[in-house]
Amino acid sequence: MNLPLSIAFAANPRTWPIMDGRAKADGIDLIANVVHPSELFWRQLKFADWDVAEMSFSSLMIAVEKGDNRFVGLPIFTTRRFFHAHILVRKDSGIETPADLKGRRVGVTEYQQTAALWTRGALEHEFGVSPRDIEFFMERTPSHSHGGATGFKAPPGVTVNQIPVEKSVGSMMLSGELEAAMHYRGQPTAVNRSSTDLRNHPDIRTLFPDTAAEGVRYYRKTGLYPINHGMCIRREIAEKNPWVIHNLMKAFERAGAIADTEREAQAEAHIEAGLLPESARVALREKVIRHGIVANRKVLETAAQYSLEQGLTTRLMRLEDVFAASTMGL
């Protein structure tokens, strides 16, 4: 008889094969739930709603350091992005370069979220803009946020204002009360209020005019492709059934292989149609998204270093503190 486990993740091409059953975990019956990550992380950190769940890497490090031992991390990495390249600014703000963010009012959905961690890290290490140089305005409330579930307090020397419940990052960007925003989503959920499409608004633009070019520049210089979300499992399940960890990892490897095959087929069709250059064929076949500790150690350790630097954790979190011991050599 298979072991039934509830699992929750956000829908994307690399997780959907788990949801639709094309990628199965041996010996496990997965009861899959697709949940927006902002709500998912709050519910898991607050209520432990699922046996296995996608999880913010930043929030997991914070929870573990604070003594929350309910979960253990799995090095299954579902989303990545060059987050700093997508900072939004008002066109009339006079913000033309990252250095211009100093002294400005900047909105963030949640200060401790991994996307904001990476954005602040890039601003500081690439452009000399410290979190202490910015006045932050946070949308999520203490009762409905990852930080509310982990006891978040603004780091020393950093100004983090709470946005009133009748406002949001989106509304304050349009009113001019905010001049810039980090990792803006514009999708209302159980914990998010912003709903305005700022990316297509005539008064708003990205700080970096060519977001793809900035991502390429950053990657070529640093070798970092920032990880946003991983997975976690209830510690009691992992300890009672240690085989589950590797079977879950194999299932997500299968899901990733399906996604890669579909991506390559789509790219091939676009090349044949003249929508992509021939040079894209080799680039798109390179496997840049991998699971496991070994392939991602530099990225994970950089995130841990940023967490310490930014005052989210008070000690440098070792990967051994966060992830299952049996995965450390994978």
Question: Residue locations for each model-derived region?
Answer:
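Pocket-lining segment of extracytoplasmic ligand-binding domains
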Residues: G147-R263
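Basic/polar N-terminal segments that are highly enriched at the extreme N-terminus
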Residues: M1-L5, K153, L330
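Conserved C-terminal helix/tail region of periplasmic/extracytoplasmic solute-binding proteins
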Residues: L312-L330
